[in-house]
Amino acid sequence: MNAFDKNDLERANGHVMEAEERHARYSALVRRMAVTGQDTTDAENLLVRFKETLDLMRQHQQLVLRQTGSAL
């Protein structure tokens, strides 16, 4: 018996997609802040955390994928 099923894979895929969109939006915001001369130190640090979280979500997605035997 697999620990994950197709619903888990769909959920993981959705989480990754949402996190990718969030990261892209925030990255664009940080670039705009930099262009306007704002201090982006904290924003850039947060962007790194977003990327780390996204990477973890992708790892989880791959685990679910392997367990369900599905293809993305």
Give the label of every model feature segment.
Residues M1-L72:
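Anionic, Ser/Thr-rich low-complexity intrinsically disordered regions
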